[in-house]
Amino acid sequence: MREINSQEMEKIRMKNLTTPFRYDYVGSFLRPEKLKKARADFEAGKITREQLKEVEDVCILELVAKIKELGYHVITDGEFRRATWHLDFMWGFDGIEHKKTVDGNTTFDGEAAMIDDTFMVGKISIKNHPFVDHFKFVKALEDENTIAKQTVPSPAQFYAYFTGAELLDTTLEIYGTEEAFAEDVIRAYGEFIEEIYAAGCRNLQFDDCVWGGLVNPKLAVALTGRRGEALEEYKKVILALNNKVVEEAPADLIINTHVCRGNYHSTFFSSGAYDGVADLLFGEENVNAYYLE
């Protein structure tokens, strides 16, 4: 009988460890107190970035050990290296900058999130995105029963952030048209996927609050600056964005999506049923599976 080599064994293992599992989770966890303290100390200049990373490493190791103990088959870093679920990913691109907010932004049921103001200063490009190294750390913790999952904001989320009512003018100054920006988002995501796939990622999750925002008719208009037919066309644009990135990804990369209505200090960003987006989101988006709230 022919012996199975290591590459073949890895393919067999990956085939049996594809998300979603019967019992699963989204991937973001509440930050431990020691991590919150370390991040605050770093922002105050009391510790170095390397010292912060040491605390992050310890917290991630403890989290993964607990996840395995509970019998889950997917492991993540809990997003412990991020300030937010989505903006840190954007900050990893050239052409995107951020600064500490003064008044807060993104209102969650009456509370303004005190997260960095994020803005575009040039055309986006990517090389050596920091999330790739973040993934490698978790990848090294895989065993025969677990597979590492990487979460990132969806292409639609990236596009929507910079084509919303507040930032669209700046985006058009840089790109000229929304179509040109959309093409660059597709290209940039393709390059990121190429990098993280080469690092061994086979389970990728698109976190997507765009659809969660669009379920609320009034909020949809406020966020996008569009209404009526223009808003319906916008929904088709973000659907096409996600689908194009999925289409161009490697065939054996599992891409799932997580749709929610936002969460900050246990408050919500949006509310409403899926009816207004269901046909597009569930009928035409070509992801492998949905994590829904």
Residues of each region from the PLM?
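Domain-level signal for soluble alpha/beta catalytic cores
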Residues: 3-293
